[in-house]
Amino acid sequence: MTSLDIAPFANALVLGLSIASIWLIAAIGLTIIYGTVGVINMAHGEFIMLGAYTSYALQSTLGLPFLLCLPASFVVVALVGLIIERGLIRYLYNRPLDTLLATWGVSLVLMQGVRLIFGSDPKYIAVPEIFQSNVEVGFASLSVFRLVVLAITALIVAATAYLFYRTRFGMQVRAVMQNKEMAASFGINADRVYMITFALGAGLAGIAGSLFGVLAIVLPTMGTAYVVQAFLVVVVGGGTLMGSVAAAGLTGELQSVFAFVTNDTFARFLLYVLIVVFLRFRPRGLFAVAKGRR
């Protein structure tokens, strides 16, 4: 195989890795919320969408640079998640069907609210010119922005791992996940843990939305498609941080390779078939999390 033959395939691999990185950020938010709170958050896609619209609004009104839009999106969407958790979700813990329906209702409210404020026309998030250039690495021509995405993802994964495995708060989260009653007997406030982790998961979805908004158009319905991929990453990964990292890389690269060989639509079909077969033989995912009493 010549360098000319290898180059498109190498570019496809890098493309898959960068897309998988954004899926991973969104999936980490889902993993945090489900693993700690036990809530299947149907509004997670709308948190992604809110992050994209936050970046768009800050750019169009204040002229805020893209890199500053990322932490701003995190804060704004985390606050929205905090309000939703305090105002609704906390009253529905240990009621899976009710939380499922409630978060689905929240997703519809958020979607229609954004449509009323911004309209249904597509919006775009701009990045600095330096991010729009390419660099030659071996056989591949890599987008600088995609390399920035990989760096941001690595930073978020490292920060999340440190928070949950090297801090007092992380110890409290893991204690609540294993046994809420036992954790309470040691003075751990489970409600506070739930509140913070829900907001944190929402904020991470906001960052993912800002990154997705650069690679695609920003629409009120954009979160629906992206949250499916995030759920797949969580399920295949087994609901753990390291499992999500492995699952995001695996699914992203597989879809990219399939799309390179066939097309995007058939690539998704093949990926979903493989996931169904995988879950048939390993229903708890790559790295299953130990379940305790909530």
Give, region by region, the residue ranges found by the protein language model.
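Cytosolic-side transmembrane-helix boundaries in multi-pass membrane proteins
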Residues: 8, 98, 178-192, 261-294
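Membrane-interfacial amphipathic/re-entrant helices at transmembrane-helix boundaries
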Residues: 1-25, 54, 65-69, 95-100, ...
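Transmembrane alpha-helical segments in multi-pass inner-membrane proteins
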Residues: 63-75, 195-205, 209-275
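Single transmembrane alpha-helix segments in multi-pass membrane proteins
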Residues: 8-59, 83-98, 236-239
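Transmembrane helix-bundle core of multi-pass membrane transporters
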Residues: 2, 91-166, 193-196, 262, ...
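Alpha-helical transmembrane segments within multi-pass membrane transporters and channels
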Residues: 63-107, 113, 247-251, 282-283
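Hydrophobic core segments of alpha-helical transmembrane domains in multi-pass membrane transport
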Residues: 52-56, 74-80, 106-114, 152-161, ...
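Helix-loop-helix "hairpin" substructures at the membrane interface of multi-pass membrane proteins
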Residues: 141-218, 242-246
